[in-house]
Amino acid sequence: MFDILMYLFENYVQNDLEVDMLVDEDQLKKELALAGFRQTEIIKALNWLEHLADLRDSEQPYLCHHEQHSFRVYTPEEMERLDVECRGFLMFLEQIKVLNVEAREMVIDRVMDLDESSLTLDDLKWVIMMVLFNAPGQEMAYNQMENMMFDEQPGRLHS
């Protein structure tokens, strides 16, 4: 499923095409099948994207009410999916104001909905990009994250 999300993100978002301008879901499914993806994985990926859009538009309490200086305690399931490096990176992004609390929670929600048992740091970065791209008012954060990803120098974790 993650491969499909990456394919869509790279072919539509990175090429500045509006995902909403896709002709229809059936045509997209056909395109993805022609690209070699399995139908079950295609459906999972499209559902994942739909849930991301729902999060953006929802009034979920965990997305609306938070203490300004609260500390995130991860559940055992979240810690299994997000290793120490990934959790540290999320904290780093919050500290430099790339992620706010709401965006962080959206990222964690989307990570937990992936059918991957664990994620690499690079996978997490792509999920963050997808969330920031889809979240209203996060254009500057998206640009910062994009710059961090594509301007990284080998051997340097942070600039």
From Swiss-Prot:
Domain of life assignment: Bacteria
Pfam family, one: DUF494
UniProt-listed InterPro entries: Smg (IPR007456)
Entry-linked PANTHER family: PROTEIN SMG (PTHR38692:SF1)
Similarity section: Belongs to the Smg family.
Annotated protein name in UniProt: Protein Smg homolog
Organism: Shewanella amazonensis (strain ATCC BAA-1098 / SB2B)
